[in-house]
Amino acid sequence: MDQLNNREQQEFQQLVEQKQMKDFMRLYSSLVQRCFTDCVNDFTSKALSSREESCLEKCSEKFLKHSERVGQRFQEQNAALMQKR
């Protein structure tokens, strides 16, 4: 990164930010699809039932905790690789 000039660093930073946004949107979309499919099954009303609401809360919590844990493991692996260098 030190070898890049200011313009190149800005371009690189912009690419990183775009990738992060794309990854976030993919995660969000996956969360919505999975939890909706698992929890919402009564289409007779446009309002969620209390059961569906509870299921959606638990599903999203579980999904986000899992994603956080995976991220932590990646950070640990990355740190271990950096120490080996």
Curated annotation (Swiss-Prot):
Keywords: Chaperone, Disulfide bond, Membrane, Metal-binding, Mitochondrion, Mitochondrion inner membrane, Protein transport, Translocation, Transport, Zinc. A motif (Twin CX3C motif) lies at residues 35-59. It is a peripheral membrane protein. GO terms for cellular component: mitochondrial intermembrane space protein transporter complex; TIM22 mitochondrial import inner membrane insertion complex. Disulfide bonds join 35-59, 39-55. Belongs to the small Tim family. The twin CX3C motif contains 4 conserved Cys residues that form 2 disulfide bonds in the mitochondrial intermembrane space. However, during the transit of TIM9 from cytoplasm into mitochondrion, the Cys residues probably coordinate zinc, thereby preventing folding and allowing its transfer across mitochondrial outer membrane. Mitochondrial intermembrane chaperone that participates in the import and insertion of multi-pass transmembrane proteins into the mitochondrial inner membrane. Also required for the transfer of beta-barrel precursors from the TOM complex to the sorting and assembly machinery (SAM complex) of the outer membrane. Acts as a chaperone-like protein that protects the hydrophobic precursors from aggregation and guide them through the mitochondrial intermembrane space. Heterohexamer; composed of 3 copies of TIM9 and 3 copies of TIM10, named soluble 70 kDa complex. Associates with the TIM22 complex, whose core is composed of TIM22 and TIM54. Interacts with the transmembrane regions of multi-pass transmembrane proteins in transit. This is Mitochondrial import inner membrane translocase subunit TIM9. It comes from Yarrowia lipolytica (strain CLIB 122 / E 150). The lineage of its organism: Eukaryota, Fungi, Dikarya, Ascomycota, Saccharomycotina.
